Amino acid sequence: MIRVAYPGGAAAHSAAAAERLFPGERELVSLETFSDVVEAAVSGGVAYGVLPIENSLVGPVAETHDLLYDAELSIVAETSIPIRHHLVARAPLAESEIRVIRSHPVALEQCRKLLGRLNGVRAIAASTTADAASQVAESDTPGEAAIASERAAAIYGLQVIEHDVGDHPEAFTRFVSVATHTRIDHERDEWRTAFSFVTDHRSGALYGAIEPFARHGLDLVQLVSRPIPQSPWKYRFDAVLAGHPLEPTTRDAFAEVRTRVRDLRVLGSYPPGA
């Protein structure tokens, strides 16, 4: 039986993503942090890890991007799940009674209108929305609430005191499955290839690096800049391309790109997720 790790408890959005990515017989392993998931996958403690990588409203999940850049792992699959945020507490609370709201920083960012309305309420970050719900369930402090899912509320015995508190209820988060192997199968018509590159940090270098993709008719579906820690104000670029590196056109484009950048790493190929 394959073992699949994800961050947070059984109530986490990552758990729901892991269930969708691995619907068959598998053992789901709950770990505390994103880095714990990566370490477990790299060490062979689990066969796969599942991590959030992008939100449709807030954008890239920086921690996941940086962890995957440094780890010897490949993205092998992806899926997207709808994210609905609810205000939950141990018992019914009026908004005027709320003193603390716990949630993941991304969830807090997606609920600005609620936080703006609750003037003076202290927002406390948690490692996941599920952990926030767990902390509220275990706390005896009056006036504590969490922004979490209905799944989390049900698991931890909390009550939903306000539904759909997100600024945009149509939010989605994209999750990826990572492993120590790289997929080389490409029987499907559509593929995605994730990669990272560093330019010479001169005028026109970024354009020169990605121009071969446009000339070969390949769609660059994502481009994210991330700072290089040891080089202040310089950046690497994480990207996703519509194509598979074993396809002749994609292979030729990558070969040309390699001659124009300082570093190029392919981070995995996988079918586009639902």
Predicted regions and their residues:
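Domain-level signature for soluble enzymes in the chorismate/prephenate branch of the shikimate pathway
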Residues: 1-274
